[in-house]
Regions:
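Divalent metal-binding pocket/active-site signature
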Residues: 1-26
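Charged helix-capping and loop-helix junction motifs
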Residues: 2-4, 29-30, 59-67, 95-99
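Acidic (Asp/Glu)-rich catalytic clusters
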Residues: 5-11, 31-39, 69-76
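Active-site glycine- and acidic-residue-rich loops that bind
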Residues: 17-28, 48-66
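Ligand-binding pocket scaffold of soluble enzyme catalytic domains
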Residues: 32, 41-43, 49, 111, ...
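Short acidic/histidine-rich active-site segments
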Residues: 45, 75-93, 114
Length: 131
């Protein structure tokens, strides 16, 4: 939150708070909203739903798709979704994104909300479209 505020103060136009749903430093709803209010984009990584026992990353607790969708629902117009995949013993990144999109839709997010997070917002961040 402090870095998000400072980035805005010094004039950074685009910045991303990554892994907001990570078990290591899982952000609260209020923390996420405060970062967004400071101009941040929020990134949620679906790897949290794929790691755990029986995977290439067995030491981490798996998040439920319902909980992940709850994070994504906070502000889809200011969020991006990644898989953070590519590790040995984990699904291929494309398969991970496929699972993520399916989980978001099955947990009540609209197709438009999903499009914001996996298409429109990432394109905006890298300058391929205008807000």
């Amino acid at each position: 939150i402090t870095l998000a505020r400072k980035a805005r103060e010094v004039g950074v136009k685009k910045f991303v708070v990554t892994h907001a749903n990570s078990g290591i430093w899982k952000m609260t709803y209020d923390q996420i909203k405060r970062c967004i209010d400071s101009g941040a984009w929020i990134e949620y990584s679906y790897i949290t739903n794929l790691w755990g026992q029986g995977t290439g990353l067995p030491d981490f607790e798996r998040m439920s798709d319902k909980e992940f969708a709850g994070f994504a629902r906070i502000a889809p117009e200011h969020s991006i979704i990644t898989t953070d995949l590519g590790q040995v013993g984990m699904p291929h990144p494309v398969e991970g994104m496929r699972r993520c999109i399916r989980a978001l839709l099955e947990n009540g997010l609209s197709q438009q909300q999903v499009n914001y997070m996996v298409c429109d917002n990432p394109a905006t961040l890298v300058g391929l479209s205008a807000i």
